[in-house]
Amino acid sequence: MVKVDYRNTKVKKPWGSEYLIYQNDTIAIWLLKIIKGQNTSLHCHPAKKTGLILLTGEASVELGFYETKKLKAPAKVMIRPGLFHSTKALSEDGITVLELETPVDKEDLVRYKDEYGRKEKPYEGKESMVDLKKDDIIFGEPENGRTLEYNFNST
């Protein structure tokens, strides 16, 4: 299977969108925007550890088949490899989430349940990709001894 380059593109999803804001050999960081009342598929990554950082809003995160956590930004949750999970936006304005994945592999995906007809289907391909806009954030590699700062709110 040909690897898709997700840099400088936004992946449109039925629940919102996501795009890659930083990647190196060991980690990929994605920015997710989830619309109110919408949720990601109940899915797992057999070989990948995932961290979710809720930047804005309130969310419900399903962990496995028996646990649900309600989160209010700022909040975080770590998800071990193989644990099925789903994230739902509860806030009127939706939610913004940073998703950290290691190792880097978008094909490491098993969809168990999906409200949008994607059960057992792979990650979206080029047909779902659009160009980033000028106000979309991309994390740069800071120079040694320096930090980079980003504002996720419009104010």
Identify the role of each PLM range.
Residues 38, 47, 67, 83-84, ...:
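A generic "binding-loop/recognition-motif" signal
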Residues 65-85:
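Short acidic-glycine-tyrosine-enriched beta hairpin
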Residues 6-44, 48, 136-155:
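A short glycine-rich, His/Asp/Glu-containing loop-to-beta-strand
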Residues 5-12, 86, 90-142:
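Double-stranded beta-helix
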Residues 52:
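Structured binding elements
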Residues 30, 40, 67-69, 77, ...:
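Short beta-strand segments
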